[in-house]
């Protein structure tokens, strides 16, 4: 089975395939306080996701993180002990690849959010640049988030967890999930540890996949049992959506995503 890693009302919704909109990093360690200045904690309708600040006014996350009463928190490390420079925003506008907000297991799970007002750079807040090149298979990638740290129950950490995983060939994910008939090509990335033990999980959806220092992916979906052997996760490929992202930010709200 597959998990769309969303943490709904602090419960993992286990569907026939579920997305990671609310996952914690399974098999990780607490992130360094200063290594995730771009990481956003996103809440909507009782669900938890992550996002990535790409400039003072825009955040990227997963489309399946969409919900009402959304709040976006920046500058967060410990949930219990807020940083003095924490800033909270709500969406001014949300943009999706398609007007119906639909997405598939292999395409269009991306949402671009314009904040109601810009955030200020600070000790714990700074944007992450968009990628300048496409990632290579074999790259070491960093994942992070406040999602559950257990594959079988909801155990949420106070601080974000970080872990290193590997960028794998997309064919590995096709082979791992034959029941979903993934297409031969896709605008998603396949990443994980084939031996298992490290993965995004429920509550981590929408968070970044950072490969060799570049923001390359958005946590989308994966195995119901996070970190399971030979069942890596899939991430929306940021590089393939650069034209769409940059066009929207420039004011061309009619821009369309790549097919």
Curated annotation (Swiss-Prot):
Its EC number is 3.4.21.-. Residues 1-18 form the signal peptide. GO terms for biological process: proteolysis. The keyword Phosphoprotein does not apply. SMART domains: Tryp_SPc. Residues 25-250 form the Peptidase S1 domain. GO terms for cellular component: extracellular region; secretory granule. Gene3D superfamilies: Trypsin-like serine proteases (2.40.10.10). Monomer. Snake venom serine protease that may act in the hemostasis system of the prey. This is Snake venom serine proteinase 2. It comes from Crotalus adamanteus (Eastern diamondback rattlesnake).
């Amino acid at each position: 089975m597959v998990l769309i890693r969303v943490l709904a009302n602090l419960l993992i919704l286990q569907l026939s395939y579920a997305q990671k909109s609310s996952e914690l990093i399974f098999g990780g360690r607490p992130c360094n306080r200063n290594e995730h200045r771009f990481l956003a904690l996103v809440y909507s309708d009782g669900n938890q996701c992550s996002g990535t600040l790409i400039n003072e006014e825009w955040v990227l996350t997963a489309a399946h993180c969409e919900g009402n009463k959304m709040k976006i928190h920046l500058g967060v490390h410990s949930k219990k002990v807020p940083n003095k420079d924490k800033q909270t925003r709500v969406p001014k506008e949300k943009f999706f690849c398609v007007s119906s907000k639909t997405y598939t297991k292999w395409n269009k799970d991306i949402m671009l959010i314009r904040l109601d007002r810009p955030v200020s750079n600070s000790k714990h807040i700074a944007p992450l640049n968009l990628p300048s090149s496409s990632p290579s298979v074999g790259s070491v990638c960093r994942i992070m988030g406040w999602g559950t740290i257990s594959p079988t129950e909801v155990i949420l950490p106070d601080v974000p967890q970080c872990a290193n995983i590997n960028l794998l060939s997309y064919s590995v994910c096709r082979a791992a999930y034959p029941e979903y008939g993934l297409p031969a090509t896709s605008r998603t990335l396949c990443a994980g540890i084939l031996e298992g033990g490290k993965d995004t999980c429920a509550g981590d959806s929408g968070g970044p996949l950072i490969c060799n220092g570049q923001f390359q992916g958005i946590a989308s979906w994966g195995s119901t049992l996070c970190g399971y052997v030979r069942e890596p996760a899939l991430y929306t490929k940021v590089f393939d959506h650069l034209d769409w992202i940059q066009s929207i930010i420039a004011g061309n709200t009619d821009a369309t995503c790549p097919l």
